[in-house]
Amino acid sequence: MNLSRVLGIGLTTAAAAWFASSSVACGTDSVNNKDYGQPPDAGIFNPGSSGGGDGYGSSGGVAPFVCPDELKACSHEFTYPFAGETSVELRGDFGGPDTWQAGVPMKRDGAVWKATTNVPFGKPVQFKFYVNGAEWKVDPAQPTVTDASSNTNNTFAGKTCEPAVCNEIGPLPTGVFDWRDSVMYFVFVDRFLDGNGANNCNVAGTSGPIANYQGGDWAGVRQKITEGYFNDLGVNTLWITVPFNNPDVTGQGVGGDTHQYSGYHGYWPKIDANDPASLAHEGCFGSFAELKGLVDDAHAKGIKVLIDYAMVHVHSSSALFSAHSDWFWPNNNGKGGNCICGEGCSWDAMPDRERCWFTGYLPHWNYTNPAARDYSVTNAVEWVKQTGVDGFRADAIKHVDISWLNELRSRIKTDITAKQTPPQRFYMVGETYDFGNRDVLKSYVDPSTKLDGQFDFPLRKVLVESVLMRTVKMSDLANFMNGNEYFYGANAVMSTFVGNHDLPRVIHLAANSRLWGDNQASDGKDRSWANQPTIPAEREAFERLANAFAVLMTNRGAPLIYYGDEIGLPGAGDPDNRRFMQWTGLNGNQTFLRDRMKKLGKIREAHPALRRGSRSTITADDDLWVYTRTTTGDTVYVAINRGDGDKTATGLPGGSLDELVTGTPATGPNVTIPARQARIFVAK
C-alpha cells in the first residue's frame, strides 16, 4: 500500500487530537514474574510459533503494511450544480476544522462544478459550498443535516475504499517536541558513573557488591551530559532510575532467591506520610538540587528527561504505610494464605494482579480507595512540578488499577500541560512484561487518557529471534512489523528495544554460541552469581547487535538504548545484567559497535523518513530485508543482511547512491550488502 503525507489540510483533526492528549519491573533484583525482575518461565508463558496471533510468521511473501482506519482516506468527488456562479469553493470537515476556513476550489465542467479530495475513511462528512467568495450554500439535491449550531450542511454517510490512502500525522506546532523523534537512553544511575564519592552508600548485609550500591549518581550523569556523550549517540531522551528515597535495609528475593539486596535500583520507595508534595529523594544519588541540575543540564543540550515512577507499592518501612495501612491491599488471599504474587495470588489474573504484594515487604497500593489514589497522583504531579521532567516511565503498569492512570493523565493536563507555553506532550511509557499478548499492552495505551505507549516486548521477541539468534527469517520480521506498526493506535509512540535491566545482556544472544539456547526470554539467572559470562570474543556478535539497532533506528517508535548495550557490555540475568558501566579499555569490537551506534543515531536525526512516514518492503527473504521509508521531502532505502555471507539488494534506485553508514560509493539498482551489515542509502 502506498502511503502519502497529509498536505496542508490533511489530518488537522488527528494532529490536534494528539496535541490535545498532551494538553517493581524491574524492581527488586530477584523477582520472578512477567512484569517484575525477569522473564517468565517457558512453561508458564508460551506464545507459540505463531507469535500469539500477532501476524508473525512466514509462509509466502511479505504481508502488506497495515494502516489504521483513523489514518486512512479515500478519494471522493464533490459536485455542485452550475447556476451562473463565477467561483465555488468546497468547504467542510473532511480535513478537520481548517477546511471550513480554507477549502478546495471547484472547477466548472459544463453544468456542474467539481472538486476531488480525500475524505476520512468510513466517517460521515459534512460540507457546504462557498459561492462567489461571499455566500454559503447547500445543494438541495444532496442529503442535508443540521449541526449542533443549527447550521444546515450537506452530508454523506462516509466512504470506504481499497486500497486506501494512508495519511501521516503532520508536524506539531513550533516549539512542541515531537516524541516520534525521540531516541531514549536508559541510565541506570547507580551503575553509570560515580561523579561524587561523598554521597556513596553501603548497606550492610547484602549478598555481594552486585546487590549493593556501587556509587553511580546524578553528578555522574550530569558529567556525561555536559561532555556530550548522549548527543554523540543521537540520544535526545534520558530515562533515569527511580529518584525516590529507598530504605537502607536489605531484602530477600522471591521465587526461591535467598540473596539479600539493597534498594540501589530505586523500586522500594518511601513516601512522606503527611504531604504528597514533600518529595523524599534518594540521597545515595545526590541532593535534590543535583537532580534538578541534571534535568536543567539535559534541557540545555536538547535532551528530555523521564523518571522511572514506581507507583505499585511502597516499602513496608515507609511511614506512609504505617500511617495509612488502609490505603494498601492486605496481604491476605482470602484462602488462609498470603497474597504474594505467584505465591498465594496470581501474577496475571484479575483481580489478583492489581493487589498482590511483589514480596512480603512491598505492600501494594489500593487505588480503588480515592484518598490513596489522590495522594499518589498528587505526589507524581509534584515530581513533575519540582524537577521539570518531561515524562514518566510507568513501572509494571498492569499491576495498577486503571483509575490511577486515568486520574494522573487528567491531572497532568490541568496542572502541567495547560500551564506551559507552548503546551507540551507529557510522555508516559509503560512497562508490561509480555512478549506475546499485544492486546494487554494496548489496553493501557491511549495518549488522551492513559499511556502514550509501552515498551514493545512483542517486537523485541521477533527482532531478537530474527536478527540476533537467526531462528526465524527476516521476512518474519518484516511481516510482524507491517502488522505491528500502528497496532497500538495512530497516536501511540511505542518504545522499541533489544535490551533492558530485567533481561540478560543482549550481546550474548548475538554470539556465535548463544547462551541460553533458543530462548530469547531466558532469565539468565543460572549465571547471575557464579560462572558469570565474559564478553564474546568474535566480531560477529557485535555486528549482529549493530544490525538489531539498525532496525530500530530506521523505523517508527522511540528506540531505547540500555546503558552499556552500545559497547556490548556482558552480563547474565539480574543482577549481573547491571554491571558498572565500562568507560575505559574498550576493545576493537566494542569501539566498532559504539561508533556504529553513533552513526545510526546521526542518520536517524538527519532523516525524518526514518522516524515517521511510511515503510514499503522492496524484498525480504531468509537473511535480507530491503525497504524504503518515505515522508514529505525525504526518501531513504535500508538494506539489512543478517546472513553470514554477502547478499545482493535489488530494487534500489538506478544510478549513484549516497551510502550513509560507511560513506562507500554505491550504484543501483543492485548493491552488495556485506555479511552481517546494514546499509542505508539516499538517491543522489
Residue positions per predicted region:
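N-terminal module-boundary/linker segments of secreted carbohydrate-active enzymes
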Residues: A63-F78, E162-F192, E382
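Beta-strand-rich binding/interaction modules
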Residues: V88-D93, G645-T662
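C-terminal beta-strand-rich structural cap/linker in extracellular carbohydrate-active enzymes
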Residues: G668-K684
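Asparagine-centered strand-capping/turn motif at beta-strand->loop junctions
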Residues: A639-G643
